[in-house]
């Protein structure tokens, strides 16, 4: 099983890259992960609602192209309106995916969200939190949660939940 993180944006602060890299390094023995950075649409200084929709559409086309290029993989999209999963639920979903041999493309949309087309094609819509999180922080939180879920599946002492 492989998890590709398709994320819009590529100029992350050093602390984001450091945090992401740490969990990426830790998870590799348990789960093959890869990050695919997709260029964010160029934004106007004071974008209109129509501009925002256009940005989501442009980024959505790039996300779907990256997903299609990989062949067969489930499409999981992070979305504030998605289903919330506990870490244990995520561990179960990943364990099921590993048993079935499913690859996953996990989408972190742009600063203005994801396009309706990407949401329509999603196999899973997942909300990390009801809170609004800074876009760069989501990369770190996502990778930490993947690592935590896989540590549960491998009986690693990292997770000390219930």
From Swiss-Prot:
Lineage: Bacteria, Pseudomonadati, Pseudomonadota, Gammaproteobacteria, Moraxellales
Keyword Transferase set for record: yes
Function: Specifically methylates the pseudouridine at position 1915 (m3Psi1915) in 23S rRNA.
Known partners and oligomeric status: Homodimer.
Location within or outside the cell: Cytoplasm
NCBIfam families reported in the protein's UniProt record: PRK00103.1-4, tRNA_RlmH_YbeA
One cellular-component annotation, GO: cytoplasm
Name this polypeptide is given: Ribosomal RNA large subunit methyltransferase H
Primary location recorded for the protein, binned into one broad class: cytoplasm
InterPro entries: Alpha/beta_knot_MTases (IPR029028), RlmH-like (IPR003742), tRNA_m1G_MTases_N (IPR029026)
Enzyme's top EC category: transferase
Bilayer-crossing regions: none
UniProt family annotation: Belongs to the RNA methyltransferase RlmH family.
Binding positions (S-adenosyl-L-methionine): 78, 109, 128-133
Keyword set, alphabetical order: Cytoplasm, Methyltransferase, rRNA processing, S-adenosyl-L-methionine, Transferase
Domain of life according to the entry: Bacteria
Alphabetized GO MF terms: rRNA (pseudouridine-N3-)-methyltransferase activity
EC number(s) per entry: 2.1.1.177
Reaction(s) catalysed (UniProt annotation): pseudouridine(1915) in 23S rRNA + S-adenosyl-L-methionine = N(3)-methylpseudouridine(1915) in 23S rRNA + S-adenosyl-L-homocysteine + H(+)
Coiled coil: none
């Amino acid at each position: 099983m492989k998890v590709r993180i398709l994320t819009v944006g590529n100029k992350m602060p050093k602390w984001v890259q450091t945090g992401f890299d740490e969990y990426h390094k830790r998870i590799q023995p348990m789960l093959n992960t890869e990050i695919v950075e997709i260029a964010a649409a160029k934004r106007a200084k004071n974008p209109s609602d129509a501009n925002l929709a256009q940005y989501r559409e442009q980024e959505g086309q790039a996300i779907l192209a990256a997903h299609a290029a990989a062949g067969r993989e489930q499409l999981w999209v992070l979305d504030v309106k998605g289903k919330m999963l506990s870490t244990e639920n995520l561990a179960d979903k990943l364990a099921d995916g590993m048993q079935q041999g499913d690859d996953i493309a996990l989408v972190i949309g742009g600063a203005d969200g994801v396009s309706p087309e990407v949401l329509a094609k999603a196999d899973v819509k997942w909300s990390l939190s009801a809170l609004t999180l800074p876009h760069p922080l989501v990369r770190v939180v996502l990778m930490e949660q993947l690592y935590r879920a896989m540590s549960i599946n491998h009986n690693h002492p990292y997770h000390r939940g219930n």
